[in-house]
């Protein structure tokens, strides 16, 4: 016997198979193999733990209210973390859910934030106003163009051009 498992599994999706153990007096963390799951494990488990062990405050998180552009279904029983693309439309912030899945790494680079679906909920409704934790500065949200409708390959070309500007704009299409 090498040690003991302190906790295995958290009620979050992605990120469920996270692990903390004591191995010969040392704290050992086990992160899931899928990249998005590993990121959730770090943000929800390891970052607060490292802050606590180092006697420091956890990094400040910016939370804003966003209006969802579409319904986001979910299964009850786990808190789901959904990456969202956020942009300003008029005087409000709107959030479009991105693809889901523990291995969907492109959503991490395309997202400006995360929305949490509580573990007792079966999802969130279109037009619901919910908190979103930003992964970018709030000022960056004003440099995102939001496009709603069917996707066209021309939009990908436009997005590339906008990112190549001296002061880049992000392009978020739904």
Tell where the protein language model's regions lie, with residue ranges.
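Domain-level signature for soluble enzymes in the chorismate/prephenate branch of the shikimate pathway
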Residues: 137-174
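Flexible glycine/proline-rich
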Residues: 2-137
């Amino acid at each position: 016997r090498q040690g003991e498992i302190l906790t295995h599994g958290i009620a979050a999706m992605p990120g469920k198979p996270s692990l903390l153990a004591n191995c010969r007096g040392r704290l050992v963390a086990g992160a899931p193999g899928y990249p998005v799951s590993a990121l959730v494990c770090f943000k929800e488990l390891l970052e607060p733990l490292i802050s606590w062990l180092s006697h420091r405050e956890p990094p400040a998180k910016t939370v804003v209210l966003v209006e969802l552009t579409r319904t986001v279904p979910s299964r009850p029983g786990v808190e789901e973390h959904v990456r969202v693309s956020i942009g300003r439309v008029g005087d409000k912030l709107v959030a479009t859910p991105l693809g889901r899945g523990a291995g969907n790494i492109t959503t991490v680079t395309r997202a400006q934030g995360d929305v949490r679906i509580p573990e007792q909920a079966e999802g969130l409704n279109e037009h619901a106003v919910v908190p979103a934790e930003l992964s970018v500065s709030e000022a960056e949200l004003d440099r995102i163009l939001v496009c709603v409708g069917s996707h066209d390959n021309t939009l990908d070309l436009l997005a590339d051009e906008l990112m190549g500007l001296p002061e880049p704009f992000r392009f978020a299409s739904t």
